[in-house]
Swiss-Prot record:
Source species of the chain: Xanthomonas oryzae pv. oryzae (strain MAFF 311018)
Annotated binding of [4Fe-4S] cluster 2, by residue: C73, C102, C105, C108
Swiss-Prot/TrEMBL catalytic activity: a quinone + NADH + 5 H(+)(in) = a quinol + NAD(+) + 4 H(+)(out)
GO cellular component term, pick one: plasma membrane
Occurrences of domain 4Fe-4S ferredoxin-type (ranges): 53-83, 93-122
Cofactor binding, per record: Binds 2 [4Fe-4S] clusters per subunit.
Gene Ontology molecular-function annotations: 4 iron, 4 sulfur cluster binding; iron ion binding; NADH:ubiquinone reductase (non-electrogenic) activity; quinone binding
InterPro entries (UniProt xref): 4Fe4S_Fe-S-bd, 4Fe4S_Fe_S_CS, NADH_quinone_OxRdtase_chainI
Entry function: NDH-1 shuttles electrons from NADH, via FMN and iron-sulfur (Fe-S) centers, to quinones in the respiratory chain. The immediate electron acceptor for the enzyme in this species is believed to be ubiquinone. Couples the redox reaction to proton translocation (for every two electrons transferred, four hydrogen ions are translocated across the cytoplasmic membrane), and thus conserves the redox energy in a proton gradient.
Disulfide bonds: none
Protein name: NADH-quinone oxidoreductase subunit I
The protein's Enzyme Commission number: 7.1.1.-
Keyword Translocase assigned: yes
Length: 162
């Protein structure tokens, strides 16, 4: 009996007709397409985009060169060099992030004990020349200085979930 049922199903092409019916059904439904450059979806408050380095309110950079972000990065995208200052504290002399390697996982942000490295909401950026994919310390500090108020607001709103 099972062979006869299988024979009639394959003879009538029921699977093919089911697929065609599904296609026909979705042809006349409204589309979910977004015209990207003109229309944009709202971003999540926890969106992880381009990196930034933050400063303290007195202007001193927050990074203490503990190198936890470099150690925890699964893609090995962060490179840090440090040096001791006259007062005995360590500070970074080189802080590079290779955006081609970075997978934007957020581990660097989570591991930072002083909230120095953060991921901003910036989604759209481009590179015109070879080597621009590596963001250095002055560029990261400039991004952080430009977006500090927004970074502080987002971190305060997300503080209950951290």
């Amino acid at each position: 009996m099972n062979k006869i049922t299988h024979y009639f199903k394959s003879l009538l092409l029921l699977e093919l007709l089911g697929g065609l019916w599904l296609t026909l059904k979705y042809t006349f439904k409204p589309k979910y397409t977004v015209l990207y450059p003109m229309e944009k979806f709202p971003q999540s408050p926890r969106f992880r985009g381009l990196h930034a380095l933050r400063r303290y309110p007195n202007g001193e950079e927050r990074c203490i060169a503990c190198k936890l972000c470099e150690a925890v990065c699964p893609a090995l995208a962060i490179t840090i060099d440090s040096a001791k200052r006259e007062d005995g504290t360590r500070r970074t002399t080189r802080y590079d992030i290779d955006l081609f390697k970075c997978i934007f996982c957020g581990f660097c942000e989570e591991s930072c004990p002083v909230d120095s490295i953060v991921e901003t909401h910036i989604l759209e950026y481009h590179f015109e020349k070879r080597g621009e994919n590596i963001i250095n310390k002055p560029q990261l500090l400039a991004i952080g200085d430009r977006l500090e108020t927004e970074i502080a607001e987002r971190r305060a709103a997300d503080a209950a979930f951290r």
